[in-house]
């Protein structure tokens, strides 16, 4: 009864515009109607309880995803971290902000790849035949690696198919 009375008062104050006092707290009664509805519906309560219980396993799935990103970022830094960045080359997906030089940049590149944004272009930019960075101290001419095929395809497979399905299955 109090919920309905508070909601009606809020609607009347809003409609007639007598805002001489700030009565915005009355909008809480609208939310109270939803809580009252949830108490009455048995099936809605069961559904919400199941949803809340699924949050217990969610941190473990998030930890597994974080471990996958961590491992792939470290491997990417070791294998592809010395690829040179060419300012004038528009075809290369390895840029100043999109590379494996630091751990944070590697994580950002992997997150970008996990979302599906041009991961194949990044993979092709990490293949052999790419020049090394002058500041890396490496005397070799090429810093790319054919390992990029396995690296990116396995990462996309694990992220897109296994982890995403595991995340959705928990929820």
Swiss-Prot record:
<keyword id="KW-0472">Membrane</keyword>
<keyword id="KW-0107">Calcium channel</keyword>
<feature type="transmembrane region" description="Helical; Name=S6 of repeat IV">
    <location>
        <begin position="144"/>
        <end position="168"/>
    </location>
</feature>
<feature type="transmembrane region" description="Helical; Name=S4 of repeat IV">
    <location>
        <begin position="19"/>
        <end position="37"/>
    </location>
</feature>
<comment type="subunit">
    <text>Voltage-dependent calcium channels are multisubunit complexes, consisting of alpha-1, alpha-2, beta and delta subunits in a 1:1:1:1 ratio. The channel activity is directed by the pore-forming and voltage-sensitive alpha-1 subunit. In many cases, this subunit is sufficient to generate voltage-sensitive calcium channel activity. The auxiliary subunits beta and alpha-2/delta linked by a disulfide bridge regulate the channel activity.</text>
</comment>
<dbReference type="InterPro" id="IPR050599">
    <property type="entry name" value="VDCC_alpha-1_subunit"/>
</dbReference>
<feature type="topological domain" description="Cytoplasmic">
    <location>
        <begin position="38"/>
        <end position="56"/>
    </location>
</feature>
<dbReference type="GO" id="GO:0008331">
    <property type="term" value="F:high voltage-gated calcium channel activity"/>
</dbReference>
<feature type="transmembrane region" description="Helical; Name=S3 of repeat IV">
    <location>
        <begin position="1"/>
        <end position="11"/>
    </location>
</feature>
<feature type="topological domain" description="Cytoplasmic">
    <location>
        <begin position="169"/>
        <end position="171"/>
    </location>
</feature>
<feature type="repeat" description="IV">
    <location>
        <begin position="1"/>
        <end position="171"/>
    </location>
</feature>
<keyword id="KW-0677">Repeat</keyword>
<dbReference type="InterPro" id="IPR005821">
    <property type="entry name" value="Ion_trans_dom"/>
</dbReference>
<dbReference type="GO" id="GO:0005886">
    <property type="term" value="C:plasma membrane"/>
</dbReference>
<dbReference type="Pfam" id="PF00520">
    <property type="entry name" value="Ion_trans"/>
</dbReference>
<comment type="similarity">
    <text>Belongs to the calcium channel alpha-1 subunit (TC 1.A.1.11) family. CACNA1A subfamily.</text>
</comment>
<dbReference type="InterPro" id="IPR027359">
    <property type="entry name" value="Volt_channel_dom_sf"/>
</dbReference>
<keyword id="KW-0109">Calcium transport</keyword>
<dbReference type="GO" id="GO:0005891">
    <property type="term" value="C:voltage-gated calcium channel complex"/>
</dbReference>
<protein>
    <recommendedName>
        <fullName>Voltage-dependent P/Q-type calcium channel subunit alpha-1A</fullName>
    </recommendedName>
</protein>
<keyword id="KW-0406">Ion transport</keyword>
<keyword id="KW-0407">Ion channel</keyword>
<keyword id="KW-0106">Calcium</keyword>
<feature type="topological domain" description="Extracellular">
    <location>
        <begin position="12"/>
        <end position="18"/>
    </location>
</feature>
<keyword id="KW-0812">Transmembrane</keyword>
<comment type="function">
    <text>The isoform alpha-1A gives rise to P and/or Q-type calcium currents. P/Q-type calcium channels belong to the 'high-voltage activated' (HVA) group.</text>
</comment>
<keyword id="KW-0851">Voltage-gated channel</keyword>
<dbReference type="GO" id="GO:0070588">
    <property type="term" value="P:calcium ion transmembrane transport"/>
</dbReference>
<keyword id="KW-1133">Transmembrane helix</keyword>
<feature type="site" description="Calcium ion selectivity and permeability">
    <location>
        <position position="117"/>
    </location>
</feature>
<keyword id="KW-1015">Disulfide bond</keyword>
<feature type="topological domain" description="Extracellular">
    <location>
        <begin position="77"/>
        <end position="143"/>
    </location>
</feature>
<dbReference type="InterPro" id="IPR002077">
    <property type="entry name" value="VDCCAlpha1"/>
</dbReference>
<keyword id="KW-1003">Cell membrane</keyword>
<keyword id="KW-0813">Transport</keyword>
<feature type="transmembrane region" description="Helical; Name=S5 of repeat IV">
    <location>
        <begin position="57"/>
        <end position="76"/>
    </location>
</feature>
